[in-house]
Amino acid sequence: MKPSIHSLTHQTMQEWVLEQGEKKFRADQIWEWLYRKRVQSFEEMTNLSKDLIAKLNDQFVVNPLKQRIVQESADGTVKYLFELPDGMLIETVLMRQHYGLSVCVTTQVGCNIGCTFCASGLIKKQRDLNNGEIVAQIMLVQKYFDERGQDERVSHIVVMGIGEPFDNYNNVLNFFRTINDDKGMAIGARHITVSTLGLAHKIRDFADEGVQVNLAVSLHAPNNELRSSIMKINRAFPIEKLFAAIEYYIETTNRRVTFEYIMLNEVNDGVEQALELAELLKNIKKLSYVNLISYNPVSEHDQYSRSPKERVLAFYDTLKKKGGNCVVRQEHGTDIDAACGQLRSNTMKRDRQKAVAAVNP
């Protein structure tokens, strides 16, 4: 199975062309064809020699993903189900924001973290995506608009799809390098956000990288007992260890951390929890920001329901009165398979049912 050409960073592209006996500037030409002109085949790279095109075809594919399903919401959200070369499925989501087009990418096939409210963890991790498969998600979303003649460009990226990005650390870093490169898509690092469920040691590593990509942490509870009950990762990285890493990140980078907090009715959404959260954040409140997120129900997790508006507002008001920076996040795609991993999970379920029906007509 040939890798995607998108697996090469600009530096490794330069190394590759030199290994082929070509001049270094050929890497810039290939890069421009891929990311500025966004061609779908090597044959379209008309300023390359036939010999170099043959070598590219022999060693790489341009697009490693196949589009299976596209769901479009009334609010402009678009959800894509892509098939990988090995037949596995991943999701990507485009969201229209007031500041531009934001794409949420997947970094793993399945997830081993096992959050009890999440559709992504219904299917255990099968493998990591390589950086080319992550880059290809952005390129196919951009292609979706290019083909419709819509003069719109992906401007922001959130690494919050299926999987734990910091469990696929090196591929995710190479994805940042490729998509941020000023000769390519040139998406600014500060327009990219990576979200972790709380791998404390990787947060420290990320602080030391010196990249300008934004950091978000999926917190979802203000104390160890509650967080461990809904996120098993808290047993390995309890809040004390997690916040020591977050404080190290802030001290090292002087950059703000966003905390994601999904609102689960009568589980973590009470005024008591809001007060606990305010206390937890009191030493870093100038460089912290809380996103209060409405829960998208998942049939397999029917013990949870979304918090009613009055509980969300009471939580928000309590946190604000304590000096916390917070916002109730805008919802997207509520009329389609909105929850992370839901489209993939539902499609796999239907595929299994069809397979059983074919065997037992």
Swiss-Prot record:
Gene3D superfamilies: 1.10.150.530, Aldolase class I. Keywords: 4Fe-4S, Cytoplasm, Disulfide bond, Iron, Iron-sulfur, Metal-binding, Methyltransferase, rRNA processing, S-adenosyl-L-methionine, Transferase, tRNA processing. The keyword S-adenosyl-L-methionine applies. InterPro entries: Aldolase_TIM, Methyltransferase_A, RlmN_N, RNA_MTrfase_RlmN, rRNA_lsu_MTrfase_RlmN/Cfr, rSAM. The keyword S-adenosyl-L-methionine applies. It is found in: Cytoplasm. It is an enzyme of class 2 (transferase). Its main location: cytoplasm. Binds 1 [4Fe-4S] cluster. The cluster is coordinated with 3 cysteines and an exchangeable S-adenosyl-L-methionine. GO terms for cellular component: cytoplasm. Residues 97-329 form the Radical SAM core domain. S-adenosyl-L-methionine binds at residues 163-164, 195, 218-220, 296. Its EC number is 2.1.1.192. Its cofactor is [4Fe-4S] cluster. One of its GO terms (molecular function) is rRNA binding. Disulfide bonds join 104-340. It holds the Pfam family Radical_SAM. Specifically methylates position 2 of adenine 2503 in 23S rRNA and position 2 of adenine 37 in tRNAs. Belongs to the radical SAM superfamily. RlmN family. Reaction proceeds by a ping-pong mechanism involving intermediate methylation of a conserved cysteine residue. This is Probable dual-specificity RNA methyltransferase RlmN. It comes from Streptococcus pneumoniae (strain Hungary19A-6).
